[in-house]
Regions:
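Alpha-helical junction/boundary sensor with strong preference for TPR arrays
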Residues: 68, 74-76, 105, 111-116, ...
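Long, contiguous interaction/recruitment modules in multidomain scaffold/adaptor proteins
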Residues: 1-41
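Alpha-helical segment of the N-proximal tetratricopeptide repeat
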Residues: 38-73
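Generic helix N-cap/helix-start motif at coil->alpha-helix transitions
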Residues: 40-50, 78-86, 115-122
């Protein structure tokens, strides 16, 4: 069933399109929510989502899928986040349309290339495959989700540093009074400005944990157990941790090659 759709496990142009957050040939989207001018009124898209949920509960899966598509075409659909668009592939799976569901996941992966969306999509791919009992193949997306979460927090750290330096420049230019003298300092920018953003330390902590052997082991242990490969968890965690620590940019085919050293996922 997945023979045509799993070309992403081989080095090919299709794999690149599915696996990496590079500039796609379609309009780039993100999961950022746009504000609505009629915030006081009930969102038509969200109303349709609720109707889809009720149809799903009634096990009317085909009708639920169509209702989701209506929601995505609604005039206020730009308010929807990627997690709400990830419902369609899972509903298609429930309707027995597994190939169509996997295709929908890959299309979302091409359209929503921001690191926040990419992490969610990779994790949903893992869930989708596990529901298909494709446990070995799910391992790759379990690890790919970690990679995208690392990229997300690296971006968060960089944003915190940039914001700190920008505020310092504004204070110097307009002679603003310092308002953070009594705030706790969590680090310093390369320019020497004190970082008082409390989230900065959280992002650094998450990065350290995600890249560590223990952190990787903890994240993949359950998935390895489902694949009946629990004994390979430690050596795989060792290699993945080393990869995360040594590289600044991650590629799906490189992750796949590391996994192939321990597990045959084809």
């Amino acid at each position: 069933m997945f023979s045509k759709l799993f070309n992403l496990f081989r080095p090919s142009s299709k794999e690149d399109k599915c696996g990496r957050a590079e500039t796609p040939s379609v309009q780039i989207k993100t999961s950022v929510v746009m504000s609505s001018s009629s915030s006081s009124s009930v969102s038509n898209a969200r109303k349709l989502l609720k109707e889809a949920t009720q149809l799903k509960k009634s096990k009317e899966y085909d009708a639920a899928c169509e209702k989701l598509r209506e929601a995505y075409e609604a005039s206020d659909a730009n308010e929807l986040m990627v997690k709400e668009r990830l419902r369609l592939p899972m509903y298609l799976q429930l309707a027995g349309k597994n190939d169509e569901g996997w295709k929908a996941l890959n299309e979302l992966n091409v359209e929503y290339v921001d690191v926040f969306s990419q992490a969610e999509i990779a994790n949903q791919m893992r869930v989708f495959l596990q529901k298909e009992k494709q446990f070995k193949k799910a391992i790759m997306f379990s690890i790919w989700a970690i990679a995208k979460e690392i990229e997300r927090d690296v971006q968060n750290v960089e944003a915190s540093i940039e914001n700190t330096d920008r505020m310092a420049e504004l204070r110097a230019e307009y002679d603003f009074l310092e308002d953070d003298d009594e705030k706790e300092i969590h680090g310093y920018t390369p320019n020497g400005n004190p970082i008082t953003d409390y989230a900065y330390e959280l992002f650094l902590s998450r990065l350290t944990e995600a890249k560590s052997i223990e952190g990787v082991h903890q994240r993949i242990e359950k998935d390895m157990k489902k694949a009946k490969l629990l004994e390979l968890t430690q050596p795989l965690a060792n290699d993945i941790s080393a990869y995360f620590s040594q590289k600044s940019h991650y590629r799906l085919e490189e992750v796949r090659d590391i996994i192939d050293k321990h597990v045959n996922v084809v």
